[in-house]
């Protein structure tokens, strides 16, 4: 059975970098997918679906539920390793509920943990506006993305806390201790 870890955090929390470094350090056992990267790759392909996705991403809004869930399910099925890390998901209560439903209807993938990389809005803003990744990294879009992230957050955290799947990592430190703590946490959860 595949073991799935979801990494959530504000824009600029470092969740994608953290997950990527963990997977790179153990590539034979861990696969990392970023919903943002999967969606941006579709946009870059120039497909009709990509154009639809771009109309949402460029404004900092959520991509429709069916598109995101299909993208993630395809990625999980294609994963070459037992352990899978997906970052940036779920981003809404609807995504969470739909994903929970999809996972409960199969027996190949087990959600082992939802790891929140916690940072203040101030640190998140500093990081996002300093990274110049693309058109979706300006102040107006940042505040919209932050609002999109924080509005459903309490309900998402409550849901996973009740399932005893929610874990917190302090994301305001340098990358090395964050990644080390996350690796340790994943190993600990897998041994339970």
UniProtKB/Swiss-Prot annotation:
The protein's Enzyme Commission number: 2.7.4.3
Catalyzed chemical reaction(s): AMP + ATP = 2 ADP
Leading EC class: transferase
Binding, AMP: 35, 40, 61-63, 88-91, 95, 133, 145
Binding site for ATP: 12-17, 131, 173
Alphabetized GO MF terms: adenylate kinase activity; ATP binding
Region of interest (NMP), ranges: 34-63
One Pfam family hit: ADK
InterPro entries found in the cross-reference section: Adenylat/UMP-CMP_kin (IPR000850), Adenylat_kinase_CS (IPR033690), P-loop_NTPase (IPR027417)
Metabolic or biological pathway, per its Swiss-Prot or TrEMBL entry: Purine metabolism; AMP biosynthesis via salvage pathway; AMP from ADP: step 1/1
Localisation: Cytoplasm
Annotated SUPFAM superfamilies: P-loop containing nucleoside triphosphate hydrolases
Keywords on record: ATP-binding, Cytoplasm, Kinase, Nucleotide biosynthesis, Nucleotide-binding, Transferase
Biological process terms in GO annotation: AMP salvage
Region: LID, residue numbers: 130-136
Cellular component GO terms held in the UniProt record: cytoplasm
PROSITE patterns named in the record: ADENYLATE_KINASE (PS00113)
Record function comment: Catalyzes the reversible transfer of the terminal phosphate group between ATP and AMP. Plays an important role in cellular energy homeostasis and in adenine nucleotide metabolism.
Family: Belongs to the adenylate kinase family.
UniProt note: domains: Consists of three domains, a large central CORE domain and two small peripheral domains, NMPbind and LID, which undergo movements during catalysis. The LID domain closes over the site of phosphoryl transfer upon ATP binding. Assembling and dissambling the active center during each catalytic cycle provides an effective means to prevent ATP hydrolysis.
Summary of subunit composition and partner proteins: Monomer.
Protein's recorded name: Adenylate kinase
Organism: Campylobacter jejuni subsp. jejuni serotype O:23/36 (strain 81-176)
Source taxonomy: Bacteria, Pseudomonadati, Campylobacterota, Epsilonproteobacteria, Campylobacterales
